[in-house]
Amino acid sequence: MLSSEALAKAVNTARQAIALAVNLDALALIKAEHLGDRSPLALARQALASLPKIDRAAVGKQVNTARSEVQRDYDERLATLQAERDAAVLVTERIDVTLPSTRQPTGARHPITILAEHIADTFIAMGWELVDGPEVETEQFNFDALNFPADHPARSEQDTFYIAPDGSRQLLRTHTSPVQVRTLLERELPVYVISIGRAFRTDEVDATHTPVFHQVEGLAVDRGLSMAHLRGTLDIFARAEFGPSTRTRIRPHFFPFTEPSAEVDVWFASKKDGADWVEWGGCGMVHPNVLRATGIDPDIYSGFAFGMGLERTLQFRNSIPNMRDMVEGDVRFSLPFGVGA
């Protein structure tokens, strides 16, 4: 047990050390030495149990008083050092609120979004309507009503994402053409609509393919429509996207849902390959079976339809060598197209 003189010496030593602490780290070490579990004051408190009961209260009071003095000095020094630290931080990390702020870099709208909106504006200006449909479709709308035969290869799991459970006849639409059927079932004739949305096929991602892509689909059904109306519409569309001098041509092709069917090309001058005919999309007159499937008499009404891939359009229009750039989400790809977020 410490004597009164030793106890006073321990207190003085601790108070002097606390007063000389220059920073919070030094003060923490001093606290451990003079107020910690192995400090002289802590050992003196532990020794109280060995004293006679008659002396324990008086000596215990002395020890508690001594510890309180040291603790008080410690608390005061701690507050002082914390205030000094905070003042130093305010000086070194001061922000001048009168200075202009640092401009934060902004993102950019994806060029596919920009292209889709431009296409929509083009057709809305012509009096067409913008329509939409579900991405999870049934075989009825995606294939059957569009005159796809039961053994058509597009129905296989090698080409189409089917939705579990097996036999549900639900799938991720492989094109935006199901919107045609839904529109004809839901609207009064005549119909002039476009649909812009995502489609899904089991393609590997490479320079010219991606399993999730965007299509624009146009449909017109009215009395007396012909291939001439289709050609005129395609010419207006092409000039809106590629410039006023753009030329188009159509080549015979086959699609289950149009007859006659054609592929449409545009005469386009790229920076890399020069001017040439470039395949753009598919088109044709709506097949009579598609009209019948929606309750329309093909002897009274006729229609035309066309469809283009937005990624394909953007790729050759802007000379983008790799379609992967469109799906990787790197804002540096979108910025050159010039429209901020």
Curated annotation (Swiss-Prot):
GO MF term (any one): phenylalanine-tRNA ligase activity
GO CC terms in record: cytoplasm
A Pfam family recorded for this sequence: tRNA-synt_2d
Reactions catalysed according to its record: tRNA(Phe) + L-phenylalanine + ATP = L-phenylalanyl-tRNA(Phe) + AMP + diphosphate + H(+)
Subcellular localization: Cytoplasm
Cofactor(s) it depends on: Mg(2+)
GO terms under biological process: phenylalanyl-tRNA aminoacylation
Positions with a binding annotation for Mg(2+): 259
Annotated EC: 6.1.1.20
Cofactor remark: Binds 2 magnesium ions per tetramer.
Keyword Coiled coil: no
Record InterPro entries: aa-tRNA-synth_II (IPR006195), aa-tRNA-synth_II/BPL/LPL (IPR045864), Phe-tRNA-synth_IIc_asu (IPR004529), Phe-tRNA_ligase_II_N (IPR004188), Phe_tRNA_ligase_alpha1_bac (IPR022911), Phenylalanyl-tRNA_Synthase (IPR002319), tRNA-bd_arm (IPR010978)
Keywords tagged on the record: Aminoacyl-tRNA synthetase, ATP-binding, Cytoplasm, Ligase, Magnesium, Metal-binding, Nucleotide-binding, Protein biosynthesis
Family, per entry: Belongs to the class-II aminoacyl-tRNA synthetase family. Phe-tRNA synthetase alpha subunit type 1 subfamily.
Oligomeric form and interacting partners: Tetramer of two alpha and two beta subunits.
Protein's name in the database: Phenylalanine--tRNA ligase alpha subunit
Gene (UniProt): pheS
